[in-house]
């Protein structure tokens, strides 16, 4: 990831999105640590899990607080699209951002079948991570606002 100052990160996230809680699922400790730091410096609340089992427990406990699922695609035991299914059952409007180091079209195709999602290719920069997170959250909030807007009859 490229360098951004703390003020740049905080400024970017607050100018691009509302405060949000992100469930981060990454089995590689170094990647999880750096990604968590970048997101927190960007102004987000981060719930971090080292794999699908821990993520499922966090999702059950915090389902009403989670705004975005940010998960690795390839993990031992269960892949990202498989993890997204039970998390989305708890929070159907959840948008998922998949992180992948592979250009595996089949995994991403399966992810598309699971519901609304976006993906980001590893390695990514802090700027591109924050931009993708902000875009995913904006899309979710815009969709939610559209569904909650009053419906007026046609003349």
Positions of predicted regions on the chain:
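Non-catalytic signal-transmission and effector/linker regions of two-component phosphorelay proteins
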Residues: 1-23, 36, 60, 64-65, ...
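Conserved acidic carboxylate
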Residues: 26
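Charged docking surfaces used in two-component/phosphorelay signaling
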Residues: 33-41
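Acidic, metal-coordinating helix/loop segments flanking the phosphotransfer/catalytic sites
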Residues: 36, 48-68, 107-108
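Acidic catalytic/metal-coordinating carboxylates
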Residues: 50-51, 76-83
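Active-site residues of response regulator receiver
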Residues: 72, 100
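As written
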Residues: 80, 111-120
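Negatively charged, flexible loop motifs adjacent to catalytic sites
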Residues: 102-106
């Amino acid at each position: 990831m490229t360098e951004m100052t703390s003020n740049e990160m905080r400024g970017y996230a607050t100018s691009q999105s509302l405060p949000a809680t992100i469930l981060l699922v990454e089995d590689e400790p170094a990647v999880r640590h750096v990604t968590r730091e970048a997101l927190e410096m960007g102004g987000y609340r981060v719930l971090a899990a080292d794999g699908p089992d821990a993520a499922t427990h966090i999702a059950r406990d915090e389902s009403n607080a989670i705004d975005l699922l940010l998960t690795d695609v390839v993990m031992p035991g269960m892949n990202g699209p498989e993890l997204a299914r039970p998390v989305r059952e708890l929070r159907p409007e959840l948008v998922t951002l998949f992180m992948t180091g592979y250009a595996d079209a089949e995994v991403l195709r399966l992810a598309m079948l699971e519901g609304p999602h976006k993906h980001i290719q590893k390695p990514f920069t802090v700027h591109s991570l924050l931009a993708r997170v902000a875009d995913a959250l904006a899309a979710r909030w815009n969709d939610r606002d559209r569904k909650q807007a009053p419906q007026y009859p046609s003349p």
